A protein has these predicted regions:
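Short His-centered aromatic/hydrophobic patch
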Residues: 87-93
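Conserved donor-binding/catalytic core segment of Leloir-type glycosyltransferases
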Residues: 187-203, 209-213
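A short helix/loop element that forms part of the nucleotide-sugar donor recognition site in Leloir-type
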Residues: 170-186
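Nucleotide-activated donor-binding/catalytic signature segment of Leloir-type glycosyltransferases, i.e.
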Residues: 219, 236-261, 269
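Carbohydrate-associated surface elements
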Residues: 40, 142, 163
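A short, well-ordered alpha-helix in the C-terminal region of glycosyltransferases
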Residues: 179-182, 336, 343-358, 364
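Acidic donor-binding loop of glycosyltransferase active sites
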Residues: 254, 265-283, 298
């Protein structure tokens, strides 16, 4: 494969969807062909020693598209014999691409394309980065579509969506669910609706709390528990909303990574009513959490925002809400699955099958490696 550098601000041990996406893909590439340039982080030394590939960390806490960074990338590329560079994301780091004197690719996620692509002051910068790149790596159809809104002068595009570790996230046998819930501090019986995300407005946790209140007072699901895992600036507001509505919701805070597979697998439904905000500037990039729920055999209810409808197939692996801000519609969708266990089971099994066949990181990394290999092939006239 083409020897290359990955240059990014977002790499483990930092926690987040993009960080996980990059690590899961790049750790599956031939280690002798990979060097990562990224930022410092607590416990980075321990993490870096466990990787099969080289990781270089800057002293600066944030990588910015400066001449200093461009020189650092050129020198490191020469040192390791890299033939190409992958820049993440397109803006701002993609701005150094044209000056590297090497073929370069840029990664396209969600808001990292949408926001600069729709603001007059940055649209032309993004268009230039995209047009001058040798390859675009899009994390799904949504960021590719956003790139095509910016300019028609695009290089080849390959879609490499987020994946999931289907060996780590697996279904639980029914006999294990009660004991697993008890171990995690959750009610052993009764319907369990799970959501995992940063607690920020566009994730729609307020809508989920209001939907939970409607479901519990309807008389159909009196033992319902809505478990919300994650941290974020919306925590205090959500606490107040739970108290106001009397919703059977619990804010679990940050869940240790080793406990996540079991938490998904002991739920009945996964729900994330993500929504678009600010005229479409804020949207869901893809939603790795939907894939983790799918691998655990759990159907999802998703808000139709950005790439979420790619992660959940409406009516097959879960339900997609056209109006994610409507708590009545969300309550109805969740209620459909809770009231029809056979349907929920079918959709959960279909979700698991799709996770194994379409979102295996081994398969996705193979496609990524083939795309990067083409970066090192000189263009023919």
């Amino acid at each position: 494969m083409t020897k290359h550098l990955l240059v990014t601000n977002d790499f483990p041990p930092k926690i987040g969807g993009i960080q996980s996406y990059l690590w899961e893909l790049w750790r599956r590439l031939p280690p002798e062909d990979v060097t990562v340039l990224t930022t410092p982080h607590v416990d980075a030394d321990l993490f870096d020693r466990d990787q099969g590939f080289r990781i270089e960390r800057t002293r600066e806490p944030v990588l910015l598209p400066t001449p200093v960074l461009a020189r650092r990338v050129r020198h490191l590329a020469a040192e390791v014999g890299a033939e190409a560079v992958v820049l993440d994301p397109a803006v701002p780091l993609g701005l150094i691409g044209a000056g590297l004197r090497l073929p370069y690719a840029v990664l396209l996620h969600g808001s990292e394309v949408t926001i600069p692509g729709r603001l007059p002051g940055t649209r032309s910068l993004l268009a230039r980065v995209l047009a001058q790149a040798s390859l675009l790596i899009a994390a799904g159809g949504y960021p590719e579509a956003e790139a095509r809104r910016v300019t028609d002068a695009l290089p080849p595009i390959v879609q490499i969506p987020p994946g999931v570790d289907t060996a780590r996230f697996t279904p639980l046998a029914p006999i294990e669910r009660a004991s697993t819930r008890a171990r995690l501090g959750l009610p052993a019986t009764g319907p369990l609706v799970l959501s995992i995300s940063r607690l920020v407005p566009r994730k729609g946790m307020d809508t989920l709390i209001e939907a939970g209140a409607r479901l519990s007072t309807s008389g159909r699901h009196p033992q319902l528990t809505v478990a919300i895992a994650g941290q974020g600036r919306d925590r205090a507001r959500l606490d107040r909303l739970i108290n106001k509505t009397g919703a059977p919701a619990r804010l679990l805070g940050r869940i240790p990574s080793p406990d996540l597979p079991a938490l998904y697998a002991c739920a009945d439904v996964f729900a994330l009513s993500c929504r678009s905000r600010w005229g479409g500037l804020e949207q869901e990039g893809f939603g790795i959490v939907f894939l983790e729920a799918a691998a655990a055999g759990i159907p999802s209810v998703a808000g139709d925002s950005g790439g979420s409808a790619e992660a959940v197939i409406d009516g097959e692996t879960g339900l997609v809400l056209k109006d994610p801000s409507d708590p009545t519609a969300l309550a109805e969708a969740i209620g459909q699955l809770l009231s029809d266990p056979a349907r929920a089971s079918r959709q959960g099994q279909a979700a698991r099958h799709r996770a194994e066949t379409d979102f295996s990181y081994d398969v996705l990394a193979h496609h990524l490696g083939n795309a990067i290999e083409r970066l090192g092939v000189p263009a023919t006239s």
